[in-house]
Amino acid sequence: LLSEKTVNGKEITPNLNKLVQKSLYFPNTFEQVNEGTSSDADLMVNTSMLPLRQGSTFFRYPNTNYNSLPNLLEGEGYATSAIHPDKGSFWNYKNGLLGIGFDKFTDYYSFNVDEQIGLGISDKRYFEQVVPMLKELKQPFYAETVTLTSHGPFDLPEKYRELGLDPELNESKLGGYFESLHYTDKQIGYFINQLDKEGLLKNSIIAIMGDHTGIHKYYDDSIGQLSHKEDWYLNTGNPTVPFIIYNPSTNEGKTFDKMYNGEIDVMPTLLYLLGVDKDKYENTTLGRNLLNTNKSFAVITNGTLKGGENLTDKEKDIYKKSLDLSDKMIRANYAHNSN
């Protein structure tokens, strides 16, 4: 997230910047995906488990049982739905997400893909069709949805480019990244406004998270080729993604800028906010509730521990081993075998 960053005096993500002021914001959320990339993010957010050490979890073990976010919320009376702009066969999303516990899976074939940008349907046309789908769900509901336009290769059509970048930057991958994020930010603003108009916003909590890093993960070399570079263009070596929790019923936000955390911490944090008894999940999640912890750390996929200054050496060793522990638990179908 290019929080509060500007080019030519224009904010890259003005809608998200406003949202952050009224949200719980975790700017040091570390990417923990492995070989399943985007699908690993779906896994972690919904199960608080780290992905397999080799291959895609959704392809290799789509039928593993989990004490998952959708399963737990179904127990609280929620309908659950996963909505994806990709085809269900991509990363084996359909089998993987239904296996995790979602009641319903909606994919590419349910959308009118009359405008495509990059990998698939434009975020504008996607959100225009997602809102009616959400309106049809029985309340209360938990819905997960994914956007595509801010994903590489960042080839946003000129007609949607609004930042007025200089020619060199505009033609570069970095410029395309800025413009793609600006476009997606605009569509997120539209989406939230539409939820409000349809009466869906006031009783909702909206969590926004990136699945993995963008420009530096795949196009880092292209930045070095620019004749002019701002310091903040450069790779810091910390692969972080945004994690924002917006509750429209509260006006005060809080930024946890000293907190280091990972994608596996999303599920226990959301369950805490939704009032689900911690006894139902705290012994089956590898992540932690970020609103009730003094531990600041994340284990990334190469085994590096980020943060953790207040951890003992024994704790650091245990957390580093969580990568292999999760791998064994998934392959052993831990939730099924514990019942």
Give residue spans per PLM region.
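Solvent-exposed soluble domains appended to multi-pass membrane proteins
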Residues: 1-339
